[in-house]
Every structure is written in C-alpha cells, then in structure tokens.
Amino acid sequence: MKNIVLIGSTGSIGRQTLEVIGSLPDRFKVVGLGSGKNWRLMAEQIRVFRPSAVAMAGEREIMNLKELLAGSYCPELGWGRTGMESLASMPEADLVVVAVTGFAGIYPTIAAIQAGKDVALANKETLVAAGHLVMKMAERHRAAILPVDSEHSAVWQCLCGRNSGEVEKIILTASGGPFREMCLEKLEKVTVDMALKHPNWNMGSKITIDSATLMNKGLEVIEAKWLFGLNYSQIEVVIHPQSIVHSAVEFLDGSVIAQMGLPDMRLPIQYALTYPERLPGSFPKLKLASLQGLTFEEPDTRRFPCLSLAFEAGLAGGTMPAVLNAANEVAVEFFLKGLLPFLGIPSVVRSVMEKHEMASDPGLEEIIEADRWARNMGVKVIRDLFN
C-alpha cells in the first residue's frame, strides 16, 4: 500500500488522479489532499477518500469546509502556503503528487523534496522557473521527480533507464491545438470559448489556452531540459494532430523509440503512481488497426510565436524562464476574462521579456522576485497596449 498526498485535488489532473487511485484501492491510500477554493468538491473527496490531513488556499475556504463537514468525518485542516507545505512533507507520505497549476506549485514541491519524498510532478512551472535549483535539491535529498505530463512520461518510458549520453535528441509532440490550420487574420478574432475547445485532451482552462498558443509545448521544452539533462539543441517539437504518439527518443545510432497511447491523462498518471511497476488499467486501450493514419509536421512559429519565446527564455537561462512563465500566466488570465485578444498573449510575454534585467544564476528568492516583477510588468504592459 502506497500512501499518497495529492495537492491540486479538485483540478483536472487532481480529479483524474483520484479516479486512478479509486480504480486501484488495494494499492493506494490517500493520506492528504490540498486544493485552491473549491471547498464543496473537497468535501466530497474527503467523504470518499478520508484523508488524515487537508489544506486549502485560504482560511475562508477552510471555514466553509468545516461547516459543510459538521457532524461527519473531518481531517486535520490547514490553509495557505504553510498548510500546503505541511501537507507535502507529511511523514507518512510515500509519494506527493503536485497537480497545482502555476508558480504556486513550486512551494509544496520544494517542501516535499526537502522532506525526502518522491514527487509525481504535474506542475510545469516549477521546473520552468527553478529547474536548476529543484533538480539539484532532489539529488541532494535523494527524492525522485516522476513526470506526469504525457509527453515527459513518454520520454521517460522510452529512455527506460538509459543514459542520456546515448540520446541524440528527444521529440516532443504537440497536437497543434484547435487553431492549427487557422490563418493570422482569423487568429486575431479568436474568442475564449473557441480557445477552450481542445480537439483531443480534457484539461483545465489555463493549460488549454497554453496548448492553443503552443506555450504549453514551450514550457514542456524547458521542463524536459531539466528532467532529462539535455541541451536545447537536443529537443525537437513536432505537430502531431492525432495525439497518439506522445513523444519519442532518437538515439545515437539513429533508432527512434516512441510511446503511443490514447490521449488520456489517466495513463501517465497511473504510470507515475505505480512506478516501477505496471498494473492493469481500467481505461480504454489503443487499437492500432482502428487508426486512420498518423501525421507529423513542423510547428509554425510565425503564427504561434510562444514556442520560440520559450526556447529563447530557456537558452537565456537565469531568471528569464520564470519571467516567461509569469508574464504568460498574467496574459492568459486577462485573455480568459475577455480583457486581452488571443494574439495579445505572445505580445505581452515578448514585451515583458524584453524589459527584464536578467539574473544569470538566481537563488530561490531571486526567482520569486523575478516572478513578482514579471506579473506586475505584465499587467502594466496590458494596460498600456490594450486598454
């Protein structure tokens, strides 16, 4: 029995993680749950999984949760950054799943690593902003970082313990999003509802917008650099509209190993939870004979410049990836509120990056400060350019 702490339990990845855990009740026990503000769903999760500890974003959510749970089982409760960090470092936890979206995921991730816990990481921003610190910290505390993203899970499975010195390059696939074939003139008129309709994946709103701009793939490029110890010249992105090949690895001898499966996040989630074992899954399986065809093409960075911006930020290093991430989070937030056009997202990110005075070898506090600066600058840029 493996004891699981899940932070981000009410989000898309969190809910699917609990679905996987629920399908393997004799293998996993949920000992801790953390989430943002959805206290009603958290109450349901507590009733089903009966964790010993729970944390939420704020005290108000905890008070509402207490009231809803009155007269029934109530775990130990905490809130805010301190509550999440306590949850991530629970002594009884064997694996901490970090499924929080955004920069906030860095705090429980670091707390789990410092407590020597293995981390199943579904939060891109942690490695994007602080990959150089987090991977060194994980090595020092002997904590494993297990990728949950389908693309990184695919690369991990293709490598299968091989030395990165045998790798020529990795190939990250992207669906291309809902606007893969849309011209620039039409992209200028993209609405929020249009952008939230991903053709293949069922995801939260922020990552769905990132997929539409290709920023999601850009963040994954930076994440892959740290997860697998590669140079950016060894990371290639190709558009694969069917989302069946989740990524591939090309080795020095020219052979390519790819990982395939249906576009279902429960598959990489289950692999991260059960690793190093593979257990029977209760989810739909890929039938090769039913496939009509698999196609691949180069990404168009003229229409989708966020991918190029991510490579630029990664190559610059230092605080620049944190600035890229923070500016993007702000831009996506304003887009989702209808306060920024779709093509304004890369414009804001580029403008904030150009204004940033980069620190080349930042510590955690410098990264946090760069994140704060970029958010403030992002808001200023939006108000100056689009209002």
UniProtKB/Swiss-Prot annotation:
Binding of Mn(2+), residues: 149, 151, 220
EC assignment: 1.1.1.267
Domain of life of the source: Bacteria
A single BP term in Gene Ontology: isopentenyl diphosphate biosynthetic process, methylerythritol 4-phosphate pathway involved in terpenoid biosynthetic process
Keywords, sorted A to Z: Isoprene biosynthesis, Manganese, Metal-binding, NADP, Oxidoreductase
Short name of any one Pfam family annotated for the protein: DXP_redisom_C
Family to which this protein belongs: Belongs to the DXR family.
Protein name, per record: 1-deoxy-D-xylulose 5-phosphate reductoisomerase
Native source species: Pelotomaculum thermopropionicum (strain DSM 13744 / JCM 10971 / SI)
Gene designation per UniProt: dxr
